[in-house]
Amino acid sequence: QQHFPWDVILCVDQSASMSSSIMYAAVCASILASLPAVNVSLVVFDTQVVDLSHLADDPVEVLMTVQLGGGTDIAGAMQYCESLVKNPKRTVISLISDFEEGGSLNRLLDCTQRLNSQQVKLLGLAALDNEAQPVYDSAIAQKLADRGMQVAALTPEHFAQWLAEVMQ
């Protein structure tokens, strides 16, 4: 039986409140990029979406490229990630955010519902502050969970474990 690779799309909020999460996501992307059975896409966003997939294996370059600040259009970023999905049942989209949507909440929820109906694995990773305490909009996180996104606030070690479980 042939095993097809997994596509993992890291969708990372780069608004001003997300600095510690950006470092964490850059390191996660580089680790995932080194795995043989994983294709990594790295997408960062504020009100604009920037695809840094070509840098996914180089966390230092990612950190030098991102520009923290600006608003937050999670819906636009998720719609971009949706356009990257080639094999829904072998795709994980991990949204790393504080879930404070500055764009259209309805667009975000509709996109999440569509992806879930295609059996894309959806992980919402809540932002952590410098003391590893969760800092996020729990009401929006709950609405995403209601539409099929698994949402958690985890340290990088626990995120790796969670991702491994989802990809089994």
Model-assigned labels for residue ranges:
Residues Q1-I9, A16-Q168:
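Acidic, glycine-rich A-domain
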